[in-house]
Amino acid sequence: MNLNIETTTQDKFYEVKVGGELDVYTVPELEEVLTPMRQDGTRDIYVNLENVSYMDSTGLGLFVGTLKALNQNDKELYILGVSDRIGRLFEITGLKDLMHVNEGTEVE
């Protein structure tokens, strides 16, 4: 399965729109995009998962690592466009309490 990734850089944040399936095979593609952003440490990151049809624990792990790196620079990770199914993953793992997870797609 292919992963579609679109990025936009704003003054105070990066926006990353993801489409497809986030799993052990495709997460490295997203990691290549997120790594320089989180290493930059000057902006929050908004990840829009509106067009993600499936996500496994590999995707969750990537977001935990991204959040940890961002928090070292007092920056935040926002997960937007979360479906009920993917939102449930964040909820049952307790990650919904650690990061900003929202069903909406509006960037603040």
UniProtKB/Swiss-Prot annotation:
InterPro entries: Anti-sigma_ant, STAS_dom, STAS_dom_sf
Annotated Pfam families: STAS
Modified residues (Phosphoserine): 57
Gene3D superfamilies: STAS domain
Origin: domain of life: Bacteria
Molecular-function GO term, any one: anti-sigma factor antagonist activity
Domain annotation STAS: ranges: 3-108
PTM annotation: Phosphorylated by RsbW on a serine residue.
CDD domains from the UniProt entry: STAS_anti-anti-sigma_factors
Keyword terms, alphabetized: Phosphoprotein
Signal peptide start-end: none
SUPFAM superfamilies: SpoIIaa-like
Family: Belongs to the anti-sigma-factor antagonist family.
Record's function text: Positive regulator of sigma-B activity. Non-phosphorylated RsbV binds to RsbW, preventing its association with sigma-B. When phosphorylated, releases RsbW, which is then free to complex with and inactivate sigma-B.
Protein name as annotated: Anti-sigma-B factor antagonist
Organism: Staphylococcus aureus (strain NCTC 8325 / PS 47)
